[in-house]
Curated annotation (Swiss-Prot):
Gene name of this polypeptide: rhp41
Family membership noted in the UniProt record: Belongs to the XPC family.
Chief location: nucleus
Protein name: DNA repair protein rhp41
Organism: Schizosaccharomyces pombe (strain 972 / ATCC 24843)
Cited function: Has a role in the nucleotide excision repair (NER) pathway. Acts in both transcription-coupled repair (TCR) which removes damage from the transcribed strand of active genes and in global genome repair (GGR) which removes damage in untranscribed DNA. Involved in the repair of UV-induced damages where it is involved in the removal of cyclobutane pyrimidine dimers (CPDs).
One protein family per Pfam: Rad4
GO biological process: mismatch repair; nucleotide-excision repair
The organism's taxonomic lineage, starting at the top: Eukaryota, Fungi, Dikarya, Ascomycota, Taphrinomycotina
Keywords, comma-separated and alphabetical: DNA damage, DNA repair, DNA-binding, Nucleus
Cell compartments where the protein resides: Nucleus
Molecular functions (GO terms): damaged DNA binding; single-stranded DNA binding
GO cellular component: cytoplasm; mitotic spindle; nucleotide-excision repair factor 2 complex; nucleus; XPC complex
InterPro entries according to UniProt: BHD_2, DNA_repair_Rad4, DNA_repair_Rad4-like, Papain-like_cys_pep_sf, Rad4/PNGase_transGLS-fold, Rad4_beta-hairpin_dom1, Rad4_beta-hairpin_dom3, Rad4_BHD3_sf
């Protein structure tokens, strides 16, 4: 039989590959560096041992490196739980960041920014209601485009904004976005320079001061709860900051141009400072300022942008203050590419001036169910958790208006109109569709017709709705859920469990377990003298489950028949230990066992209190005796 630990029936174990470096037969040369920077560590252990030898005649340095084997760490359920909790906490922190910056955008000290906007643009943002709908819409969009062009000329991007974080790399304080207080937020606005995120927030403040209903939109760059690619993030995309390059130049120039390092270690790393994100991709927007000569590397797609309400069309219009005017109102142009390592679109929240937050992710992503696998809603509790969050920060239903109803209808239409993905990778873990190859070990397609086909290198494969997928479990698993296999029921499928073949059954092949009743005040027991009580329905007819702390002592005191209740199992170090909770007795003794259990519990608490008082008195006696001895010693011997 299979234990509860095998109920997931995963096809493969998950592992983290730690690339500790593999030797390469090629001999490489490089400028000499400080030897203290040539070692790396994982979990605090040094993985590279160096034995440098120096001959300053011709200045030659030889470094031998002893390389350990490639290490593999198994991913446990605790690791997954920790990452999920980090994901949830990071999501809440970024949401709070959005709410805070949105409040700062409404500060009165930013009202002066309106003076940079020409009068013609101000008029275009408020077209006359006497004109036709088409003209008002065109005039409003023209005003937004002019405002974007003015703001791009006025504001200079000098620092990095928020980027996609990675687990594999530590935070680099020189590369993260600016950290501002409210005073600095308002004061720095006079400089008209900073990160792209900061400039977008000032742009939202300008629109609101121009009496244009504006929402600040934030694509939350949340740490993922998945492990796939976690190590690649740490080693594949590395950068060389300015201080590291300078150290390299200084070291090589101080000794000699002929200095070199002979290494039997493959050429794969530069000396780097750990960073908070990957900055080595050429598809990012590189901006070099004239004042600081600082290279600002940002994703081509924004993390912050704004939505301005178009009264003519009664809908929100998306605007990137530092993008091209052609993307105004085109939601899908804001989604970053899947190869963009600086920006990911998982959660997109929009916040109004009144502080109400709304999830508008469906509006900006082409395939919502493709990114759903990276959201917390993919878990059974995820949707309820998100609803609980938005019940605090979302707009109450009582405050809904026509434009909210129109937007909700549009989001629902986008969700329902999404079709079958075109590639196999997107179909994996898809919440609506499934391929037979992606089924878990305990899953099978029992009934139902296919809803589509997809071409693969092995031919044509059928696509099925996920609602037709049935989960099969062993008879032992169903028994622990209070169900047994129906007589003559056929298994859903058979799987190998060691040398045996284990049949798996779906819920339709099971029925509710009916335990034997209590007869003559005798409780039915299993082979171990206990009673299985995994769910309340497994309690026998005529029995009573006493969960009080002293229930066992009370049953022994009354000298009645009882059975210890096994309510589950604790799995520790690959061994299962039954979890006992109270006793089961005849319902006839319910009142008596409750009363006796409470009395015994009270007596034990009183006895424990007496022991505590006795121990305290003994300790006080010891302390006072010691003080008396100390005083006598000082009096007699000074």
């Amino acid at each position: 039989m299979m234990s509860d630990e095998d109920n997931t029936y995963s096809d493969d174990e998950e592992w983290l590959d730690l690339d500790l470096g593999l030797p390469n037969n090629d001999i490489k040369t490089a400028p000499i560096l400080n030897s203290s920077l040539l070692s790396s560590a994982v979990h605090g252990e040094r993985l590279i041992q160096e034995r440098p030898t120096h001959d300053f005649g011709d200045v030659e340095a030889t470094v031998d490196r002893t390389v350990e084997k490639r290490s593999r760490l198994k991913i446990t359920s605790v690791d997954r739980k920790i990452r999920l909790q980090i994901h949830q906490l990071h999501l809440l922190c970024l949401t709070y960041h959005l709410c805070t910056r949105n409040t700062w955008c409404d500060d009165n000290r930013l009202n002066y920014l309106v003076k940079y906007i020409p009068p013609g643009i101000r008029v275009s943002l408020h077209p006359s209601s006497q004109k036709s709908q088409m003209i008002r819409n065109k005039t409003f969009l023209h005003g937004l485009a002019g405002l974007v062009e003015v703001w791009k000329r006025k504001y200079k991007i000098t620092t990095n904004g928020l980027r996609k974080p990675n687990y594999g790399l530590l935070q680099n304080n020189s590369l993260i976005s600016e950290s501002l207080s409210l005073e600095e937020f308002c004061k720095n606005s006079k400089l008209l320079s900073g990160s792209r995120d900061y400039g977008t927030q000032l742009f939202a403040s300008i629109l609101r001061n121009l009496n244009v209903p504006t929402r600040l939109v934030f694509s939350l760059q949340v740490l993922s709860f998945r492990f796939k690619g976690a190590i690649n993030e740490a080693s594949s995309h590395e950068i060389v900051p300015a201080w590291s390059q300078q150290m390299e130049n200084d070291s090589s120039s101080d000794i000699s141009e002929s200095a070199h390092i002979t290494s039997r270690f493959r050429k794969r790393r530069k000396i780097i400072q750990p960073s908070f994100s990957n900055l080595s991709h050429l598809d990012a927007s590189d901006i070099v300022t004239e004042d600081t000569k600082l290279k600002v590397i940002d994703s081509p797609k924004p993390v912050f942008w704004v939505e301005a309400f178009n009264k003519a069309m009664q809908k929100w219009v998306c605007v990137d203050p530092f993008g091209d005017a052609s993307v105004i109102g085109k939601y899908r142009r804001f989604e970053p590419a899947s190869s963009d390592h600086l920006n990911q679109m998982t959660y997109v929240f929009a916040i109004e001036a009144n502080g109400y937050v709304k999830d508008v992710t469906r509006k900006y992503c082409l395939h919502y169910y493709k990114i759903l696998k990276n959201r917390v809603e993919i878990f059974p509790f995820g949707k309820a958790w998100m609803n609980r969050i938005f019940s605090k920060i979302g707009k109450p239903r009582d405050f809904y208006n026509d434009m909210d109803a129109i937007e909700d209808a549009e989001l629902l239409r986008l969700e329902q109109s999404e079709g079958i993905p075109r590639n196999i990778q997107d179909l994996k873990d898809h919440p609506l569709f499934v391929l037979e190859r992606h089924l878990k070990k305990n899953q099978a397609i029992k009934t139902g017709k296919s809803c589509g086909r997809i071409n693969t290198k092995n031919g044509v494969e059928l696509v099925y709705p996920r609602k037709y997928v049935s989960n099969g479990f062993s008879a032992e698993h169903w028994y622990r859920k209070g169900r047994i296999i129906k007589p003559g029921a056929q298994p859903l499928k058979h799987v190998k469990n060691g040398d045996k073949v284990l049949p798996l059954y779906d819920e339709e092949a099971t029925q509710l377990y009916t335990p034997k009743p209590v007869v003559a005040n005798i409780v039915p027991k299993n082979a171990y003298g206990n009673i299985d009580l995994y769910v309340p329905s497994m309690l026998p007819y005529g029995a009573y489950h006493c969960r009080k702390r002293c229930a066992l002592a009370a049953a022994k005191f009354l000298e009645i028949d009882y059975a210890k209740a096994v309510v589950g199992f604790d799995f520790q170090r690959k061994y299962s230990k039954p979890k006992l909770e109270g006793v089961v007795v005849s319902k006839r003794y319910e009142e008596a066992i409750d009363l006796i259990a409470e009395e015994i519990d009270q007596e034990e608490k009183e006895a424990e209190a007496r022991n505590v008082r006795k121990t305290c008195l003994l300790l006080w006696k010891r302390l006072i005796t010691g003080l008396r001895i100390r005083q006598r010693v000082f009096e007699e011997y000074g």
